[in-house]
Amino acid sequence: MCLKMRYERIKYILLFSLMHLVYSNSTFESFTENPHISSQISNVLYMDQMFIIYILICILLILISVIVYLSKRYSQQMMQSSDNITNRRSNPEVRNKSNIYDLPPLLDVTSVNEETPIVKRPINERIENLEFDPRFEIDQAKLEISEDKLGSGFFGEVCYGLLSMRTSNTETDTLQKLSVAVKQSNDPTQENQEKMIEDETKLMCAIGRNPNILAIIGAVTANSGSARNLLIVEFVECGDLLKFLEEKKSIFKDELVYEKNGYLLPKSIRRKTYMFNENEDDVIEESLDSLCTSDLLSFSYQIAEGMEYLASIPCVHRDLALRNVLLNKNKTIRIADFGLARKYQVDGYYRITKGVGTPMPARWMAPEVMREGKCTEKSDVWSYGVSLYEMFSLGELPYSNVSNSDVFEHVVQGNQLPMPQYCHPKMYDRMKQFWNFDATFRPSFSKCVEFFEEHLSVSATNLLEQIQKTLKSEAERQSKLEDWIRRD
């Protein structure tokens, strides 16, 4: 019936068009002056206009549905791809790398005081559900603590120490000593200070060992009758990475150069590349009297490796910056200080948002952390991007022209850090992805590691192989630290 009516309307239109051609304008106008005919023409034209609009709306809705479907499908593919990467990285046969990623945590964090597996939330948000593993208890008589301070903070201090161990049970054996760092509260009578050391000890037990994470050796706790809690960790010889970059800036060797054909292009768009000598087996010099682009790439890759390990636990760092990355004399790094200071409202470089709430290192914090206090792997990724700015600028302060109190407003207005002087353009493109305001669009740390592996495999294969070989040796060395708590 509807089709028949539509057919009749079309006939009317064709008829009137034909009449317009056959008769003169005056004749046609006189014909259409008939009110009945004029009304029918208007109705037909109006209905046809409505029909065309209806068709256009249907087409628009179909296009929107297709776009939404393709978007969801793409998101699912990206999630599946991310899962595949994670599985590949955790499978030594597939990954064909060293076994440094397969070291088991020293505490089974999925079964400690938990009805629900602790992996459902970051362990530093579930610290009250963890218990100290008694296997890490150290006899204080075997520990010598020097008066030499390695560092100090609002609640605690770190001192150099020596831990003693005999190689066997015979009377003639010599006593071995291991250099360690000992963390203790400033005032053992302050309950909150002691609680902070206790919580950090439990957290480090749960994290386990990774060559790019500062490893726990043991602890002296109140369970052994001690008057104060002592946390014993690896001694990292060269202090924090930020200070190292600042001190070595004058001898830095820039290995990032313009391509030979760059003169054909305007300087602003000339392409940069690395100038590595791939004929050398060791791209990185272990001497601490040298610093070059290869070192910066190595440090950046190692931080991503360590953060990927933390994210797999999961553990959110919450305070990632180069001041919290330590450097060994063989140029391997250790990520330290897992943000527990924020829980206890330590000031200093932190600021309080609008005068209340928990303290924050504003220059490194993601916007959602400043607004909502929500810390996730993706907020750590934002901080990692800021740390890379520090890295490739050789220690420049992020947003150096902005005061602490104005950093938040500066960031939320869409201002990003500029490309550092010694940064490859492809690296900077990646860094800008870390600073996406929508955290879901920031890459995971697995993706960060994958980026560096692809980046280095193309530009510096020997450098990548050297880093991975060194990290394997560090993992083996860390595994031997258990001897110092298992032998009497």
Swiss-Prot record:
Q: Which GO BP terms sit in this record? A: cell surface receptor protein tyrosine kinase signaling pathway
Q: Which InterPro entries does the record associate with it?
A: Kinase-like_dom_sf, Prot_kinase_dom, Protein_kinase_ATP_BS, RTK, Ser-Thr/Tyr_kinase_cat_dom, Tyr_kinase_AS, Tyr_kinase_cat_dom
A GO CC annotation given for this chain? receptor complex
- Keyword Glycoprotein assigned to the entry: answer is yes
Q: Where is the active site?
A: D319
The Protein kinase domain, residue ranges: 144-458
**Listed EC numbers:** 2.7.10.1
Its signal peptide is 1-26
Glyco sites are at N25
Question: Gene3D superfamilies attached here?
Answer: Phosphorylase Kinase, domain 1 (3.30.200.20), Transferase(Phosphotransferase) domain 1 (1.10.510.10)
Task: Give the primary localization class.
Answer: membrane
The record describes its membrane topology as: Single-pass membrane protein
Q: Which PANTHER family match?
A: PROTEIN KINASE DOMAIN-CONTAINING PROTEIN-RELATED, TYROSINE-PROTEIN KINASE RECEPTOR
What job does this protein perform?
May be specifically involved in cell-cell interactions regulating cell fusions that generate the hypodermis during postembryonic development. It has a role in the development of the HYP7 hypodermal syncytium.
This chain's protein is named: Receptor-like tyrosine-protein kinase kin-15
Q: Which organism is it from?
A: Caenorhabditis elegans
